[in-house]
Regions:
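Pre-Walker A (pre-P-loop) alpha-helix and adjacent loop at the N terminus of AAA/AAA+ ATPase modules
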Residues: 36-77
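Conserved catalytic/switch belt of AAA+ P-loop NTPases
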Residues: 146-174, 178-187
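A short helix-turn-beta junction within AAA+ P-loop NTPase domains corresponding to the substrate/partner-engaging
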Residues: 181-202
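Walker A/P-loop
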Residues: 77-107
């Protein structure tokens, strides 16, 4: 079993908490709640641990994975809604990795494309791309700008009976919500939604430090302050840019000492 017996009940409780938290700004994160969410997830979801402090996203992540586990016929397509039309692709990639490890994707292949790229591509080009991606994941950035005709087209090409590609839409909350509302026939394929539009500075710090741990690195004492300083030069909620800064820091640490697995504050710039 991918999930231990009894976790479904725990996940249902967490999902209720997440729904109650929707629309509420939380100033302090309850670490016990984060631990509960983490325990409710299978080990294959380790790439998603770093996002669990975000409300309501953390509870929604647990709920989505548990719901799909209990209902194998449920769509695995996903919508990630944030503050911008950019900066969320890494979340989509982490879901793609999780889907692969859980056996929900049959192919490790994943591709990122912008709404502009979808809109400008011919049907033949999209068909060829989806055939190459067969069994994998497609992440569409700034998806609120996808044209209705191209949205319908890509859903048809990615259907289980065709290329069986899981679609992950990312984008700004209002634009993406409106796009789905204007395309109700297609929107029924996207019942799994995760909201990152209430993300706060403390969540961004948690994500960065969680990513360091995920990569096997131990941060120097006082790293939280360094991350906060880094965030001052970034758009609020731009997770992609934050994780790129951590990757760059890890590259500096490896160049300095490839064995210590120690990340210094000076590495994060």
């Amino acid at each position: 079993e991918l999930l231990e017996q009894g976790k479904e009940e725990e996940a249902a409780k967490l999902a209720s908490e997440a729904e109650a938290a929707d629309g509420v700004q939380v100033e302090e994160q309850d670490t016990s709640s984060i631990d509960e969410k983490r325990k409710a997830l299978p080990k294959e979801a380790k790439y998603l641990y770093k996002y669990l402090s975000v409300n309501p996203a953390g509870g929604q992540i647990v709920n989505i994975l548990q719901t799909i586990k209990m209902d194998s016929n449920r769509t695995k397509n996903l919508v990630v809604l944030g503050l911008h039309g950019f900066g969320l692709a890494n979340i989509g990639e982490d879901f793609a990795r999780t889907y692969l490890d859980l056996g929900w994707c049959k192919n490790a292949a994943k591709a990122k494309i912008s709404a502009k790229g979808i809109n400008s591509a011919s049907k033949d080009k999209l068909t060829g791309a989806m055939n190459k991606l067969k069994g994998g994941c497609l992440i569409i950035e700034n998806a609120g700008l996808v044209r209705p005709d191209k949205f319908k087209e890509i859903i048809e090409l990615c259907a289980p009976e065709k290329s069986d590609v899981k679609i992950i839409l990312t984008g700004e909350k209002v634009a993406l919500s409106n796009m789905l509302a204007d395309n109700m026939s297609q929107a029924r394929h996207f019942n799994n939604r995760v909201y990152f539009d209430q993300i706060q500075e403390a969540n961004m710090v948690d994500i960065a430090k969680g990513y360091m741990s995920e990569k096997g690195y131990k941060p120097e004492s006082g790293m939280s302050g360094t991350i906060k300083n880094l965030l001052m030069s970034m758009e609020t909620g731009n997770i992609d840019r934050l994780l790129k800064a951590v990757d760059d820091g890890i590259a500096r640490a490896e160049a300095r000492d490839p064995l210590s697995k120690k990340l210094l504050k000076a590495d994060i710039q």
